[in-house]
């Protein structure tokens, strides 16, 4: 789903669609699998519900898992879609996934 893009990011394509909620969501099983593959260190017990950090165009945001989101879909609040090039959702878009260290930096800056 995601491939290496740079030292700080992976690149993938997801269907981007609006949600009525107030946070970014993706299917919970995909969220856990990506969390395990990208963010887990393999040292002891690790949480797999830690938010993923993604970037659409110029905006970073934490992504949480939800059972009601279709697979291969990124559900974003309307406010996050404003000012983007997403038209007529669901729209297949390139999305960046921050690597583990970059995600930690971004979450620390956001106070999450």
Predicted regions and their residues:
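Long, compositionally biased stretches
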Residues: 1-112
């Amino acid at each position: 789903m995601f491939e290496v893009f740079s030292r700080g990011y992976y690149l993938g394509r997801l269907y981007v669609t609006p949600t009525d909620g107030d946070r970014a969501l993706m299917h919970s099983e995909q969220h856990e699998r990506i969390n395990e593959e990208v963010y887990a260190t393999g040292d002891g017990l690790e949480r797999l519900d830690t938010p993923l950090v993604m970037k659409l165009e110029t905006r970073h945001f934490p992504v949480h898992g939800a059972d009601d989101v279709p697979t291969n879909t990124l559900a974003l609040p309307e406010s996050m879609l404003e000012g983007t090039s997403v038209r007529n959702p669901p729209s297949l878009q390139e999305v960046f996934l921050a690597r583990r260290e970059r995600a930690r930096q971004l979450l620390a800056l956001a106070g999450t």
